[in-house]
Amino acid sequence: MLPGCNDSSDRGIIIKDAHLYMPLEGSDMAAGYLRLENHQLKKIIISSIECKKVKASLHETVIDLEGMIKMKKLEMFSVGPESHVNFIPGGMHIMFSGLKEFKESILMCAFLSVSGIEIPFVFEVRTNEK
């Protein structure tokens, strides 16, 4: 499986450009980003994400009533038929923890839908070096 791609295209679900940057020294947390495309004629509802070797959870950046920017854990999200969702900085993203000892260039993960479908994909792990 290529980094940033998935093998669920036969189900009409495609994940593109899945990537995360390794945390700076002294931290073990990082955010991951991707594009999830739903080419099905029905909505899909994602309830969680699981990754090998590290913890991962779904989050969204929100602005509260006082104008404060906060990170909120998502219990689930949906992608409409023939639609897509972008996980981007300042929006929906995946938070990873336990990366301090992680030394690999890819990270195997899977979205889990409320209907029990597993959508496997690979994150490309990038360094912060230029």
Give the residues covered by each predicted segment.
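Compact, glycine-rich, soluble single-domain proteins
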Residues: 10-130
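Bacterial signal peptide processing site
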Residues: 6-8
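C-terminal motif of bacterial Sec signal peptides marking the signal peptidase cleavage site
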Residues: 2-4
